[in-house]
Swiss-Prot record:
Keywords: Cytoplasm, Ribonucleoprotein, Ribosomal protein. Signal peptide: none annotated. It holds the Pfam family Ribosomal_S9. Coiled coil: none annotated. GO terms for molecular function: RNA binding; structural constituent of ribosome. This is Small ribosomal subunit protein uS9. It is found in: Cytoplasm. Belongs to the universal ribosomal protein uS9 family. It comes from the Eukaryota. It comes from Syntrichia ruralis (Great hairy screw-moss). One of its GO terms (biological process) is maturation of SSU-rRNA from tricistronic rRNA transcript (SSU-rRNA, 5.8S rRNA, LSU-rRNA). PROSITE patterns: RIBOSOMAL_S9 (PS00360). The keyword Transmembrane does not apply.
Length: 142
């Protein structure tokens, strides 16, 4: 039995994690969350930025299945776009050729670095003596 050509990559934004399972296929991209239900509409385009940047021809021979968990709507969209981009680069590196992988990577990095590199910023924890991480309760002298 022949081995299935597949790669699995993840994208993260804050607490949202998207896992993309990428294998040879007909160009289908399936999400656990129906993309038509995402509001506002600009976020829908944001999720498929890698597809719009590289064109459908790069995705023609690849099927992608995406699971996303955690975070809010915007964080999930950013995690999805990162996992799609990383999965395509990994697939081209492993099963196609190094030259086309480098072209894809250069296009994505030139457009937006966060398509391939995760954003390390996290929410700062609350401390005592105030309502939040940095704000303090008002001080009274009398």
């Amino acid at each position: 039995m022949a081995a299935v050509e597949s790669v699995q990559c993840f994208g993260r934004k804050k607490t949202a994690v998207a896992v993309t399972y990428c294998r040879r296929g007909r160009g289908l991209i399936r999400l656990t969350v129906p993309i038509e239900l995402v509001e506002p509409e600009i976020l829908r385009y944001k999720a498929f930025e890698p597809v719009l940047l590289l064109g459908r021809s790069k995705f023609a021979g690849v099927d992608m299945r995406i699971r996303v968990k955690g975070g809010g709507n915007t964080s999930q969209i950013y995690a999805i776009r990162q996992s799609i981009a990383k999965a395509l680069v990994a697939y081209f590196q492993k099963y196609v050729d190094e030259q086309s992988k480098k072209e894809i990577k250069d296009v994505l990095l030139r457009y937006d670095r966060t398509l391939l590199v995760a954003d390390p910023r996290r929410c700062e924890p609350k401390k005592f003596g105030g309502r939040g991480a940095r704000s303090r309760f008002q001080k009274s002298y009398r």
